[in-house]
C-alpha cells in the first residue's frame, strides 16, 4: 500500500467517524426527547389515574345514595298506605288473606291474615 492509498483510507475513516459522530449526536438528542416525553406522559397518567379514582368514588357514593333512596321509597311503598289499609280492614273484622278476602271474620283471628300482615 502506498502513501496515497493510506492517506485516502485515513480520510475515508475520518469521514466515517464524523458521520458516526453526527448520528450519535442525533441519537442522543432523540433519546433526550423521548425521555422528556416519557416523563410528561408518566405525570399525565398519574393525574388521570387520580381523576379516575375520584370519579369512581363519586360514582360509587352516588350509586349507594340512589340505592338508599330507592330502598327507602320501596320500603315505604311496601309497608305504606296499602299495608295500613289492610291492617285497618282486618281490625274492622274483615279477612285480608287470599283465601277469604273481604268476608267477615266470625271466629276471632285468622292465621292466614295474620301471616300476611306480618310479612315485610
Swiss-Prot record:
| InterPro entries hit by this protein | YabA
Recorded superkingdom: Bacteria
Q: Which residues bind Zn(2+)?
A: 95, 97, 110, 113
In residue numbers, the region (Disordered) covers: 57-77
What are its GO cellular component terms? nucleoid
- Say where the protein is mainly found: cytoplasm
- One Pfam family, please name it: YabA
Q: Where in the cell is it found?
A: Cytoplasm, Nucleoid
Q: How is the cofactor bound?
A: Binds 1 zinc ion per subunit.
Q: Which cofactor does it need?
A: Zn(2+)
- Membrane spanning residue stretches: none
Any GO BP annotation: DNA replication
Kindly state which keywords UniProt assigns to this record, in alphabetical order.
Answer: Cytoplasm, DNA replication, DNA replication inhibitor, Metal-binding, Zinc
Provide the assembly information.
Homotetramer. Interacts with both DnaA and DnaN, acting as a bridge between these two proteins.
Q: Which family does it belong to?
A: Belongs to the YabA family.
Describe its function. Involved in control of chromosome replication initiation. Inhibits the cooperative binding of DnaA to the oriC region, thus negatively regulating initiation of chromosome replication. Inhibits the ability of DnaA-ATP to form a helix on DNA; does not disassemble preformed DnaA-DNA helices. Decreases the residence time of DnaA on the chromosome at its binding sites (oriC, replication forks and promoter-binding sites). Tethers DnaA to the replication machinery via the DNA polymerase beta sliding clamp subunit (dnaN).
What protein is this chain from? Answer: Replication initiation control protein YabA
Q: Which organism is it from?
A: Bacillus licheniformis (strain ATCC 14580 / DSM 13 / JCM 2505 / CCUG 7422 / NBRC 12200 / NCIMB 9375 / NCTC 10341 / NRRL NRS-1264 / Gibson 46)
Task: Give the gene symbol.
Answer: yabA
Amino acid at each position: 500500500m502506498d502513501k496515497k492509498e493510506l492517506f485516502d483510507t485515513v480520510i475515508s475513516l475520518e469521514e466515517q467517524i464524523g458521520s458516526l459522530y453526527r448520528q450519535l449526536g442525533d441519537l442522543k438528542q432523540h433519546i433526550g426527547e423521548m425521555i422528556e416525553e416519557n416523563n410528561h406522559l408518566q405525570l399525565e397518567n398519574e393525574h388521570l389515574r387520580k381523576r379516575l379514582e375520584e370519579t369512581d368514588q363519586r360514582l360509587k357514593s352516588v350509586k349507594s345514595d340512589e340505592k338508599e333512596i330507592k330502598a327507602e321509597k320501596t320500603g315505604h311503598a311496601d309497608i305504606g298506605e296499602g299495608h295500613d289499609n289492610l291492617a285497618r280492614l282486618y281490625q274492622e273484622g274483615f279477612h285480608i288473606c287470599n283465601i277469604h278476602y273481604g268476608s267477615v271474620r266470625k271466629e276471632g283471628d285468622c292465621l292466614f291474615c295474620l301471616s300476611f300482615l306480618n310479612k315485610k
